[in-house]
Swiss-Prot record:
Gene3D superfamilies listed in its UniProt record: RuBisCO large subunit, N-terminal domain (3.30.70.150)
Subunit structure: Heterohexadecamer of 8 large chains and 8 small chains.
Top-tier EC class: lyase
GO molecular function: monooxygenase activity; ribulose-bisphosphate carboxylase activity
Single Gene Ontology BP annotation: reductive pentose-phosphate cycle
Protein name: Ribulose bisphosphate carboxylase large chain
Chain positions found as N-acetylproline: 3
Lipid biosynthesis found in the keyword field: no
Predominant place of localization: plastid
Family: Belongs to the RuBisCO large chain family. Type I subfamily.
Keywords in alphabetical order: Acetylation, Calvin cycle, Carbon dioxide fixation, Chloroplast, Lyase, Methylation, Monooxygenase, Oxidoreductase, Photorespiration, Photosynthesis, Plastid
């Protein structure tokens, strides 16, 4: 029989949607010649805020 290990929920990944501005947006970022621009059109399902649907793509 293998030994049991205890998993703590507070360690590592914490589920939930974070505010976009706090996690991805960096206003002081300066573009480089090697950067690639990608555009996505997102249509949220009924009842889903547009910002949350956009975060799912990010």
């Amino acid at each position: 029989m293998s030994p049991q290990t205890e998993t703590k929920a507070s360690v590592g990944f914490k589920a939930g949607v974070k505010d976009y501005k706090l996690t991805y947006y960096t206003p002081e970022y300066e573009t480089k010649d090697t950067d690639i621009l990608a555009a996505f059109r997102v249509t949220p399902q009924p009842g889903v805020p547009p910002e949350e649907a956009g975060q799912a793509v990010a």
